[in-house]
Amino acid sequence: VAVLYAPTAGIVCPFGLNIAMAENAAVNGVSFFFDTKVETIERMRLAEHSGTSELSENEKAGFQIKTSRGTFEAKYIVNAAGVYADRFHNMVSEKKIKITPRKGEYFLLDKSAGKHVSRTIFALPGKYGKGVLVSPTVHGNLLVGPTATDLDDKEGNYTTADGLGEIRGKSGKCVKNIPLRSVITSFAGLRAHEEGHEFLIGELEDVPGFIDCAGIESPGLTSAPAIGKMVAGILKEKMDLKEDPNFQGTRKGILDPSRLSLEEHNELIRKNPAYGNMICRCEMISEGEILDAIHRPLGAKSLDGIKRRTRAGMGRCQSGFCSPRTMEILSRELKVPMEELTKSGGGSKLITGHSKEIYQGEDAE
């Protein structure tokens, strides 16, 4: 038996990283349009639109993006749409690509199992990726997975008995006695697999102004900062970009009281009693942290938005206790009726109505 030790390897919270980057972008002027479905992308002529006739051919080419919330016009598009990247690429380019959703299922174990391994343990990579791994998380849980199953369904992020069984079997070959009785949830995600096994990054030859970031699967998260710089460099060459003297390069994170000393924590509660009102008992998340998550740049508007910013609902009971209390806070702070709140945006509403009203309606029938 032999292993390859990588002392510089590390782990990061993917939710926290993405939210931090997005909040920093928002502070620096980036606009976000959530729950907005792209329906069509068409090439257009900016010269015709603006009445200008002195532009080069590349400068004349632009895009009209029709969405569920209106029409947008853009001179450049960066296509970082994951499993849907092929759909948008193929709307504008004659050189078609295909992205296959590759499903990966996982087990997440309770923090009581978090020290079962101290490093990420990878199996030998194969045709479908790096295989089933066993890894600690930055918050002290144990993560086991993923599988690799190619699908036709670009929304197929469901778990299966076969997939979870595969995790049980393969993970035990690398790490013995994994306490799978401590599993608190299982989930699945989709990786954007390009049929040529390539990251497709760059401006399309036949569509100036359209920049692909397609087929970004493992190690996509690790590669993301470098990919971002690469794409920024492409845009810098094509646009007259100037450094913003008011750019804010740092972002203040959500206060984590668990990192404070007892004296500092007590002083925090004295100044703001909301930090002493525990909402999530599994993860010990206070009302103060939830309020911070709601009212910061690009603040949370859903139950999952709170969970991914604060970990309220990520513990052993998986929101069984705290979700009603979190929803009450969201409803109060956003001035939105409880019936309109969602789990993760879109149509994922959590409440259908008041039970007494439903029963009265049935009696009337």
Predicted regions located by residue number:
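Flavin-dependent oxidoreductases
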Residues: 41-43, 66-145, 149-160, 169, ...
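Dinucleotide-binding Rossmann-like beta1-alpha1 core, especially the glycine-rich loop
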Residues: 1, 5, 131-132
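C-terminal catalytic lobe of FAD-dependent flavoproteins
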Residues: 129, 138-139, 155-278, 285-298, ...
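Short Fe-S-cluster ligation motifs
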Residues: 307-323, 340-362
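Iron-sulfur (Fe-S) cluster-binding segments and ferredoxin-like electron-carrier domains
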Residues: 155, 286-297, 320-338
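Helical element adjacent to the flavin cofactor pocket in flavoenzyme catalytic cores
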Residues: 5-44, 61-75
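Intrinsically disordered, low-complexity terminal tails and inter-domain linkers enriched
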Residues: 44-62
